[in-house]
């Protein structure tokens, strides 16, 4: 994302198996933030159910994106999954699953998790389309990590504010 190159250059960077120093720094920062947020959350049975639904929901959103968003390239795992499936039917099923999970999360008091996931999903679409020309498997993984940490932050904030 930090490259000023065009979409083709950014896709080439994604293919590179080497890891740069700034990637390692960001990875360590991510782990520290995730660990800190996990330490802030009191995992009660209710929170355990919320978190389980949230993890299922983020993966359903990831699948929905592969089925609904444009693809950045004609190769790779995301392309394989998208072209091997009936995209319309997959979109319908995953959209229904996402809606049911959102209702379940909201009913348990996890509206902030739904809001966080929705915001990250919208950002995912904008970044994937604008910077890469569509979705790739690497971007799907990026979305999962972003979505998970933002939902964990929302969960921690709700507990801290006494909402949960």
State what each model feature region is.
Residues 1, 61, 140:
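Active-site His/Glu-centered metal-binding helix of metallohydrolases
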Residues 1-46, 50-51, 89-104, 144-151, ...:
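Multi-pass membrane catalytic core of lipid/isoprenoid biosynthesis enzymes
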Residues 14, 59, 138:
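Divalent metal-coordination and catalytic microenvironments
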Residues 52-68, 118-128:
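Transmembrane alpha-helical segments that form the membrane-embedded catalytic/substrate-channel core
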Residues 60-94, 131-135:
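Solvent-exposed interhelical
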Residues 89-108, 113-125:
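Hydrophobic core of alpha-helical transmembrane segments in multi-pass integral membrane proteins
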Residues 126-150:
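Interfacial loop-to-transmembrane junctions
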